[in-house]
């Protein structure tokens, strides 16, 4: 598979993984507020709410033989982009007083099959957690 085909497949897998993650979160009682929220060159895969908590979710779709663990797949630079976009979303939508959290949903591919492996609530914080 050439580089362009790999990128297309990765994009396709990412979109399917995000849809799967959204469905998984809905089943856990979350309301999906936004999918693929864009601000400047920043994107948040999913923004969900449950009770008084808004979670900004990064979805990572990887093959089952991937070595990288989910929390390590979101580097500090990406986290900073997420924090910036989240701040913009909160200001734009005038979200009231609520808990804000940054989560990761890890989706694994095995051949043609995909499934959610884990949902890590509070995977990282603006303060380096």
Residue ranges and their predicted role:
Residues 36, 60, 103-105:
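Solvent-exposed beta-strand sheet faces enriched in polar/charged residues
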Residues 39-42:
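Short acidic/glycine-enriched loop/turn segments that link adjacent beta-strands
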Residues 1-35:
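Acidic-basic catalytic patches of nuclease active cores, encompassing PD-(D/E)XK
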Residues 25, 44-67, 82:
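Conserved catalytic cores of phosphodiester-cleaving nucleases, focusing on short active-site segments
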Residues 92-129:
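Domain-level recognition of nuclease-like catalytic cores that cleave nucleotide substrates
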Residues 62-88, 92:
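Mg2+/Mn2+-dependent nuclease catalytic core
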Residues 33-34, 91-93:
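Short helix-to-loop capping/linker segments positioned immediately adjacent to catalytic or ligand/cofactor-binding
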Residues 32-34, 56, 102:
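Hydrophobic residues on conserved beta-strands that form the core of alpha/beta folds
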């Amino acid at each position: 598979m050439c580089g362009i085909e790999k990128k297309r497949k990765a994009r396709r897998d990412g979109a399917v993984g995000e849809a799967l993650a959204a469905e998984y979160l809905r089943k856990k009682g979350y309301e999906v507020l936004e999918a693929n929220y864009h601000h400047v060159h920043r994107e948040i895969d999913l923004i969900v709410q449950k009770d008084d908590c808004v979670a900004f979710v990064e979805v990572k779709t990887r093959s089952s033989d991937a070595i990288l663990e989910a929390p390590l797949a979101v580097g500090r630079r990406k986290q900073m982009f997420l924090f910036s976009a989240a701040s913009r979303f909160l200001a734009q939508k005038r979200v009231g007083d609520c808990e804000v959290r940054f989560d990761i949903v890890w989706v694994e591919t095995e051949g043609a099959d995909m499934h959610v492996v884990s949902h890590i609530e509070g995977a990282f914080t603006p303060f380096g957690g």
